[in-house]
């Protein structure tokens, strides 16, 4: 073989070696690894200021690896669609079960994510009202949001999981109030309450975080949002009164490892450890610090004075579960769809 031929053979071998090496899983055999976290907007501070740094420290001490994070924070529904459309997230930490199921149905999550403790949930909250300090308009209950001249804010359910929780809370409150008065749920009461409040909604932003930003700019008399969004704003100084209506919904927020992306990236060990860490006592205390209700019973007991229990609290099962609620409220003939399109929903 000529010298030139030998040089080409060596060069080809080196190139093939490098390409092969670059496609090998980067896990505990390397000094560095990476996690791509795709989350809804609301827990951004908890992740960036507490949870990610604590996990990085723990993982470094355990394995010697430095783990870096790429992060994306947008509305939950938009985030789910981004993952389905090619965002290579290793972890989906979203607002609601249905958004995780969107990724699952696309074939990207292949395991039973609800088999984790707490059915795969990592935080809880409730839907509450935020009003200006001192509550100048004396807003106490959902009916107060139907009064003429009251400017209401909540985001759009087309992009925001938080908005779906808000709308579920309103519709469910109508059912609950009817049940407490008559002994039976009345869908008409739910529709009437939702329709009356929707007439007073001035802006529907893309996410719960954007709705809070709009409220902070001085637009609106009341923002319907996650309790934790309001507690976060009040951490350093009390900016808003947090109002808990008697009837409201318990919010539960899921997380799941995205199998197809993890297998492509070869980082399953560190991603599984991070997902497990989110339910640890340490992470649950961090979530509680930023206003989220813990799923861990021990941490919830430690923080119970921070989180009032609304009198007529209900969960998604009260509305028949997510599949039923999605169809009856947001489907083509759904209640909310009918209201915003100017026709009577089913």
Language-model features, listed with the residues they occupy:
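Early extracytoplasmic/lumenal segment of secretory-pathway proteins
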Residues: 22-106, 113-116, 226
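Extracytoplasmic
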Residues: 30-32, 64-66, 74, 78, ...
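Periplasmic-binding protein-like
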Residues: 121-126, 190-198, 205, 236-268, ...
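Ligand-binding pocket segment of bilobal, Venus flytrap-like solute-binding proteins
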Residues: 177-245
């Amino acid at each position: 073989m000529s010298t030139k031929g030998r040089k080409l053979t060596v060069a080809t071998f080196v190139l093939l070696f490098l390409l092969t090496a670059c496609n090998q899983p980067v896990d505990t055999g390397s000094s560095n690894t990476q996690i791509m976290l795709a989350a809804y907007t609301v827990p951004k501070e908890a992740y960036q200021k507490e949870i990610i740094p604590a996990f990085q420290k723990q993982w470094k001490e355990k394995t010697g690896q430095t783990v870096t994070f790429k992060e994306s924070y947008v509305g939950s529904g938009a985030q789910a669609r981004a993952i389905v459309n090619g965002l290579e997230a290793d972890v989906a930490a979203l607002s609601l079960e249905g958004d995780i199921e969107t990724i699952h149905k696309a074939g990207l999550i292949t395991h039973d994510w609800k088999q984790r403790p707490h059915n795969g949930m990592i935080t809880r909250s409730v839907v509450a009202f935020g009003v200006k300090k001192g509550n100048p308009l004396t807003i106490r209950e959902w009916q107060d949001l139907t009064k003429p001249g009251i400017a209401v804010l909540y985001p759009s359910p087309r992009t925001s999981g938080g908005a779906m929780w808000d709308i579920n809370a309103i519709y469910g409150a109508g059912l609950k109030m009817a049940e407490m008065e008559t002994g039976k749920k009345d869908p008409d009461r739910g529709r009437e309450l939702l329709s009356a409040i929707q007439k007073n909604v001035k802006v529907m932003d893309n996410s719960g975080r954007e709705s809070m930003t709009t409220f902070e700019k001085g637009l609106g008399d009341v923002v319907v949002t996650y309790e934790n969004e309001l507690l976060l704003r009040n951490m350093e100084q009390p900016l808003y009164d947090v109002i808990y209506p008697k009837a409201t919904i318990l919010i539960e927020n899921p997380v799941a490892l995205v199998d197809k992306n993890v297998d492509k990236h070869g980082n399953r060990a560190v991603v599984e450890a991070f997902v497990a860490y989110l339910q640890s006592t340490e992470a649950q205390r961090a979530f509680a610090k930023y206003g989220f209700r813990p799923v861990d019973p021990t941490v919830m007991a430690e923080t119970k004075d921070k989180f009032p229990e609304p009198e007529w609290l209900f969960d998604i099962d009260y509305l028949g579960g997510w599949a039923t609620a999605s169809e009856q409220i947001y489907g083509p003939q759904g209640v909310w769809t009918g209201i915003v399109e100017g026709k009577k929903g089913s």
